[in-house]
Amino acid sequence: MKAAWLITIAPFAACEPVPTAERFIPDYRGVETMLLDDDLVQFRVSMTNALSARDVENYAECAAAGYTLIRGWGFARHLRTNVDEEAGVWTADAVYTISPALPRGIRTIDAEVVSAACAEKGIPTV
């Protein structure tokens, strides 16, 4: 009886969609940059095909590094990042302070180093 049951459901097991490579290639959908103060910047990024929240956080960090360099400064300090996912679209709302010198704090980034790492990983900056 068990064997008959397995035989009848076996054809339906093949109906599961097989993941394709395209589902694992990040699709970076853009960055919105808002200057909140002279050295305080908010970044809103969105992407699909992220494997985890860390992917969209990295995208926001790359945007912050690129923006910092565009402003002619060299460093940024991460203040906060809120991540959300809805219907496969990941978003991050991140705030950084930017500065010409290394700021105080534990979550600081050297914009040149981070931008180079982003380029190596194929993550766009601003």
Per-range role (PLM):
Residues P11-A14:
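C-terminal motif of bacterial Sec signal peptides marking the signal peptidase cleavage site
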Residues E16-V126:
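Secreted/extracellular ectodomain signature
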Residues M1-T8:
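Sec-dependent signal peptide recognition
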